Amino acid sequence: MKFFINGRFLSQKLTGVQRYAAEIVKAIDVLLASEQTPASLRNADWQLLTPVDASEQLQLERIKIRAVGRLRGHAWDQIDLARAAAGGRLISLANSGPVFHRDHIVVIHDAQVFRRPDFFNWRYLAVHRTMGRLLARHASIATVSAFSRKELAEVLNLSATAIPVFPNSAEHFARTKPDPDIIARLGVQPQKFFLFVGSKTKNKNLSIAIRAVQLLDRADVPLVIVGGDNSKVFQDNSGDGVSGLLLAGRLTDGEIAALYAHASAFVFPSLYEGFGVPPLEAMIFGCPVIASTADAVVETCADAAAYFDANDAESLKQLMLERLAIGAISDQERRRQQERVAFFSWQKSAKSLLDHLAPSANIASAA
């Protein structure tokens, strides 16, 4: 039997979705060398199909990498990939794929385009809503959390029991070596700053964190904002005239790891998530997490975070004050974090995916 993996993610800007796809592929590659994996899967022909403009590369042992076609973007998905993957089972891990492939499983990470249309422009909504509905009709849908399974089942008119869950993980970040020089370069004091890491997109809800900083009124304990173009962070002028904000811009993983390790707390005010990886990254480095009550975030963090309503800046301010009063993370808090981080594993998610694929592989090998 042939298994084809949609490698379009290797031609896209690296975000959480592309990271997920890359880590799952690498974990599958490792599992295919294990005797614990069914022979029907180990002996199958595995190929990662990529566009010619793929800029990222993976080092794989069991999965062949093959560039196909000449097109780019969605056109590559719908034409070049569909043609190259004909006759095999196709696995798409990054929200999109050929809508008319006859044997296709696609991981859709969340239902934002249906639940929060205010986050997107009309062109993006039109494309991704249409694609989601067509994929739900012609492919098998999987996702990354129980919350996203419930949401996708409702908006795509599917049975939740028919949507398997292959969760995210933050294991990859544990391999990151912190670069402590960033602390001095930013001019902050250990355990005397709060940290926000994320894009400027509406769902990340940076404005509520900025409002909480205004209410906190502690210029000596800044909010360090990592990610995105500084010139665009405050495009709605939400940060104008606010003291206690420090714009760090884009940083390396090592620099971010060092900030996690030295922050008073990591602030995660998201309005909507399909999973929520950054809090787990913070927990790896022993950083207390103050997170919104968005359903997927609570599912991910469980009892290892302090929570506030994403629309309530006063509640966030109070948690920030409490964290400053508590000081360093306690041993009990650290144990909860470690348990939560260990709960999610790329290998466990990849094994769940392979277990899902095994019945069809067994049938094919017996034919």
Predicted regions and their residues:
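Carbohydrate transferase catalytic cores enriched for Leloir-type hexosyltransferases
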Residues: 1-367
